Curated annotation (Swiss-Prot):
Main location: endoplasmic reticulum
Cellular location(s): Endoplasmic reticulum membrane; Nucleus membrane
Residues passing through the membrane, by range: 7-27
Signal peptide positions on this chain: none
Cytoplasmic topological domain residue ranges: 28-230
Protein name: UDP-N-acetylglucosamine transferase subunit ALG14
Topology of this chain in the membrane: Single-pass membrane protein
Stretches of the chain found on the membrane's Lumenal side: 1-6
Source superkingdom: Eukaryota
Length: 230
């Protein structure tokens, strides 16, 4: 089989997988046999953090300022290609704990951006599929082959923008399959005072905890108002 045909069949198979997952999410309830891994309150918990660039990264940095780094380890920071601001934020976050935190306790994972500001619809669809493909490999397939019993992280915290929707969808695959899965926490942006963002509306049905910072933004089901968090 030629390389071109191989790539074509691979893209087709991946597209069918994506459609199957979307149909499962739309028409069926999550598997009742799926489960989050249980651990005592003082046990270690691996953490995934998405840094969405700009104001999203600044808010996430503030959210993590009170994190118990001894418990939540190892930490995986997920960011988009070329996002130097988020890389500097990781350095600031980790160095804020001084020499108490080992550099071996965190990892960096770079993904292509799902959508850029002002990007046309057609090219957005292509970039979303590219991000979904790479995220599925790195966050689902490779961890599954290494250890089928464990998700890539125990807990994933996201706060936008669009690329985090892809991360949540990929993280949800294990739940659909009835495997131990990643808990998902979404924190709506401080800027969303009266309504949810588009990313928030898409993630709300899938998140284990969906937090907003303003009372007027909590009029939807499964939304928790916790006050100002950043």
């Amino acid at each position: 089989m030629s390389l071109g045909r191989y790539i074509g069949w691979s893209i087709l198979a991946f597209t069918y997988l994506v459609l199957a997952i979307l149909l499962r999410l739309i028409f069926l309830q999550p598997s009742k046999t799926s489960r989050a891994s249980y651990r005592p309150k003082d046990a270690k918990c691996s953490l995934g953090v998405f840094l969405g660039s700009g104001g999203h990264t600044s808010e996430m940095k503030a959210l993590l300022s009170t994190l118990d780094y001894e418990r939540y380890q190892p930490r995986t920071y997920i960011y988009c290609h070329g996002d130097d601001l988020s890389l500097r934020a990781v350095s600031d976050i980790e160095s804020s704990k001084g020499g108490l935190i080992s550099s071996k306790m965190y990892y960096l994972l770079s993904l292509p951006r799902a959508r850029r500001v002002g990007q046309p619809l057609l090219s957005t669809m292509v970039s979303v599929l590219k991000t979904l493909y790479i995220a599925a490999l790195r966050l689902f397939l490779i961890p599954l082959l290494k250890n089928p019993r464990r998700p890539f992280v125990d807990l994933l915290i996201v706060n936008g923008p669009g690329t985090c929707v892809v991360l949540v969808l990929v993280s949800y695959i294990r739940r659909i399959l009835g495997l131990e899965y990643t808990r998902i926490i979404y924190v709506e942006s401080f800027a969303r005072v009266k309504s949810l963002s588009l990313s928030g509306k898409m993630i709300r049905p899938l998140a284990d905890r969906f937090l907003v910072q303003w009372p007027d933004a909590s009029d939807s089901d499964n939304v928790i108002h916790k006050g100002l968090l950043v």
